[in-house]
């Protein structure tokens, strides 16, 4: 399907977004364009709201994960897929059909910038008439420019050369999707990804201060909060200092020889609303914290977050209930730094990805820690989909404890587990690889 198509069109439940020109957008009804007024009572939707559909991405390196996600979600919610082009759609169809799923029941959307971790590119809301809309945040490719400047200061290539690879076209994907689906768009001056937006749907936003600051380097906290309070439905912000230590910003050092690959602190790794006043918080096994340096840092950080949340209230002044959810046992593997490394792969690293001041050399061995957390769960109507870490060394009794917590806070929902480890090695997970479209009124 040609990238230069003047208007989006449907074919076998397929919609093409790439190439939606300004002239074409002008032909859309006024309520479908960016800046359209939202009905009174608009709000960013909460993850625990009823779900109209779950969107998935496609990437050849994650085919098995996509198949597992689609198979688990299929009985509970309609599936839609955001893929780069017709070729990717064909491959995705084959993956679904290989699991016995009817790909003709899936709505495919094409966009040349479609990411695999679709959660981060688009944020949905519901207006007062319960019609979905899109919140258009600025896109920084997970703070890539700042990471480049920090990492390559004093090195070649220069920071500016690295930063030119931002792929900022992804930042307009949410607007293109909103326009093509006939949805209004609310534009924000803030930069963030969907995995860093945690709301209760009733006025409260939980923000990781370190994360939001890394994406909005030219804004102080007061300025950011003013913009947050302009977001649809947001009346109060709770600031938490930091996220999980092993969710580093891109590839980076955690402590000593321990390194990670992550987002720099997405809230969907460590703090999630179960309902409007119940907050799930990642927690560390204290025995593990006593013996493992990464677990020790995580315990310190989560204790600080717990203290803040326990003393906080929702937007209406009601106290929050904070429930500690055990983290899986720390998952790690040794990696030898090599100048010949193909860094497209999660298990290949080079000394060049670290700041010069750290003094790392090719041939050094580092210990990569996976970005693992049960809180990177997916809610899909009557289903709770959790990561499965027993095969990665987490004691079965700990995972059963996690299951019991989820069954208690999500009564009436089935709790199922899925292997997410390959996504965890690159800073993602099941929640990152899914995008929740809230149920509105048809």
Identify what each model region corresponds to.
Residues 1-10, 24-25:
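N-terminal secretory signal peptides
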Residues 4-5, 13-14, 133, 388:
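Residue-level marker of intrinsically disordered, low-complexity segments enriched
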Residues 14-33:
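N-terminal export signals
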Residues 31-442:
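Histidine/cysteine-enriched polar flanking segments
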């Amino acid at each position: 399907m040609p990238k230069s198509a003047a208007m989006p069109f449907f074919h076998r439940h397929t919609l093409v977004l790439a190439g939606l020109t300004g002239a074409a957008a002008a032909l859309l009804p006024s309520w479908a364009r960016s800046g359209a007024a939202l009905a009174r009572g608009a709000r960013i939707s909460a993850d625990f709201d009823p779900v109209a559909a779950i969107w998935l991405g496609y990437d050849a390196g994650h085919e098995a994960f996509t198949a597992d996600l689609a198979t688990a979600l299929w009985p509970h919610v309609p599936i839609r897929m955001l893929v780069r082009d017709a070729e990717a759609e064909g491959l995705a169809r084959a993956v679904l059909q290989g699991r016995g799923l009817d790909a003709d029941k899936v709505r495919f959307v094409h966009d040349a910038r479609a990411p695999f971790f679709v959660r981060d590119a688009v944020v949905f809301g519901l207006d007062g008439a319960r019609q979905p809309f899109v919140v258009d945040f600025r896109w920084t490719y997970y703070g890539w420019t700042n990471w480049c400047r920090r990492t390559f200061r004093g090195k070649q290539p220069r920071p500016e050369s690295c930063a030119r690879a931002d792929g900022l076209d992804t930042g307009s994907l949410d607007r293109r999707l909103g326009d093509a689906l006939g949805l209004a768009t609310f534009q924000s001056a803030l930069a963030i990804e969907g995995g860093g937006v945690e709301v209760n749907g009733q006025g409260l936003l939980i923000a990781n201060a370190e994360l939001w600051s890394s994406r909005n380097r030219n804004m102080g906290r007061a300025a950011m909060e003013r913009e947050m309070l302009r977001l649809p439905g947001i009346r109060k912000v709770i600031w938490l200092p930091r996220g999980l230590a092993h969710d580093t910003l891109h590839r980076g050092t955690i402590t000593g020889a321990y390194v990670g690959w992550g987002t720099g602190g997405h809230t969907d790794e460590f703090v999630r609303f179960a309902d409007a006043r119940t907050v799930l918080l990642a927690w560390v096994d204290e025995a593990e914290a006593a013996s493992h340096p990464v677990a020790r840092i995580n315990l310190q950080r989560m204790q600080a977050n717990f203290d803040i949340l326990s003393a906080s209230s929702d937007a209406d002044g009601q106290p929050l209930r904070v429930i500690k959810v055990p983290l899986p046992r720390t998952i790690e593997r040794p990696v030898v730094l090599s100048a010949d490394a193909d860094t497209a792969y999660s298990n290949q690293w080079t000394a060049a990805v670290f700041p010069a001041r750290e003094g790392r050399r090719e041939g050094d061995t580092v210990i990569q820690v996976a970005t693992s957390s049960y809180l990177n769960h997916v809610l899909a109507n009557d289903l709770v989909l959790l990561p499965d870490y027993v095969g990665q060394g987490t004691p079965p009794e700990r995972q059963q404890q996690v299951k019991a917590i989820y069954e208690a806070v999500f009564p009436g929902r089935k709790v199922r587990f899925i292997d997410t480890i390959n996504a965890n090695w690159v800073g993602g997970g099941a929640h990152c690889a899914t995008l929740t479209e809230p149920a509105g009124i048809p």
